């Protein structure tokens, strides 16, 4: 089994990639996270687009550890906010990773926006960097922003994001399997599967 570093400390992201690999029948890779390797200096997320941030994180992880590395950068693009929060999604309220504060600010900004103008998309860019080269893919998940949070699954803006393909439920009301099948990150990770299969075969 060859190690594949997921350049994140978010265990939910690690579990999501593991489910995608299992569903695709990809074997021969052992997933490890940043918590499983020696600490290294991580570059700040300064890219203007998701792809830049994902690639920078994967490059840093590969350079520091020598392990094939996968990284993602994802966020929410809201039409009424001209595509924001975008790459600032995780720190929209000024506090990085404060899901409740970020969501509360988003809902406040959209308070007077009518339902027909609350369109939004989750976007995920995933990058794989290994000795064989670099691959970058992108997945999108269209929907709209609800008026109040619903559901207790997922993370981030999931409780206020109503996907177009979820029969009125928020992303936080979907099971992990349902979310994997249609989510932005699930779509991006599935696009990465052929490269991961090649990586597994090369090391098998």
Swiss-Prot record:
Catalytic activity: XTP + H2O = XMP + diphosphate + H(+); dITP + H2O = dIMP + diphosphate + H(+); ITP + H2O = IMP + diphosphate + H(+)
Cofactor binding mode and count: Binds 1 Mg(2+) ion per subunit.
GO MF annotation: an example: nucleotide binding
Binding-site positions, substrate: 8-13, 74, 155-158, 179, 184-185
CDD domains listed in its UniProt record: HAM1 (cd00515)
Enzyme class (EC, first level): hydrolase
Gene Ontology CC entries for this record: cytosol
Biological process (GO), any one: purine nucleoside triphosphate catabolic process
Binding site for Mg(2+): 73
Record-annotated membrane-spanning stretches: none
InterPro entries xref list: dITP/XTP_pyrophosphatase, ITPase-like_fam, RdgB/HAM1
Signal peptide: none
Active site per the UniProt annotation: 73 (proton acceptor)
UniProt KW keywords: Hydrolase, Magnesium, Metal-binding, Nucleotide metabolism, Nucleotide-binding
Cross-referenced SUPFAM superfamilies: ITPase-like (SSF52972)
Pfam families the UniProt entry points to: Ham1p_like
UniProt cofactor(s): Mg(2+)
Record carries keyword Magnesium: yes
Source taxon at top rank: Bacteria
Disulfide pattern: none
UniProt xrefs under HAMAP family: Non_canon_purine_NTPase (MF_01405)
Family named by the database record: Belongs to the HAM1 NTPase family.
PANTHER family: INOSINE TRIPHOSPHATE PYROPHOSPHATASE (PTHR11067:SF9), INOSINE TRIPHOSPHATE PYROPHOSPHATASE/HAM1 PROTEIN (PTHR11067)
Self-association state and partner proteins as the record states: Homodimer.
Function comment: Pyrophosphatase that catalyzes the hydrolysis of nucleoside triphosphates to their monophosphate derivatives, with a high preference for the non-canonical purine nucleotides XTP (xanthosine triphosphate), dITP (deoxyinosine triphosphate) and ITP. Seems to function as a house-cleaning enzyme that removes non-canonical purine nucleotides from the nucleotide pool, thus preventing their incorporation into DNA/RNA and avoiding chromosomal lesions.
Protein name: dITP/XTP pyrophosphatase
Species name: Mycolicibacterium paratuberculosis (strain ATCC BAA-968 / K-10)
């Amino acid at each position: 089994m060859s190690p594949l570093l997921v350049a994140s400390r978010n265990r939910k992201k690690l579990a999501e990639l593991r489910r995608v690999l299992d569903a695709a029948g990809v074997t021969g890779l052992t997933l490890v996270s940043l918590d499983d390797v020696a600490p290294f200096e991580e570059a700040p997320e300064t890219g203007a687009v998701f792809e830049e941030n994902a690639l920078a994180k994967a490059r840093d992880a590969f350079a520091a550890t020598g392990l094939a590395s996968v990284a993602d950068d994802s966020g929410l693009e809201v039409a009424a906010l001209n595509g924001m929060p975008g790459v600032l999604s995780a720190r929209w309220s000024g506090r990085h990773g404060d899901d409740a504060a970020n969501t509360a600010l988003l809902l406040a900004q959209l308070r007077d926006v009518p339902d027909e103008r609350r369109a939004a998309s989750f976007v995920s860019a995933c990058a794989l960097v290994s000795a064989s080269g670099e691959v970058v893919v992108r997945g999108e998940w269209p929907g709209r922003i609800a008026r109040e949070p619903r559901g207790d699954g997922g993370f981030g803006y999931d409780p206020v994001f109503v996907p177009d393909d979820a029969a009125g439920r928020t992303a936080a009301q979907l099971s992990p399997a349902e979310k994997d099948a249609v989510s932005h990150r699930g779509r991006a990770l599935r696009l990465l599967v052929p490269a991961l299969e090649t990586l597994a075969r090369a090391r098998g």
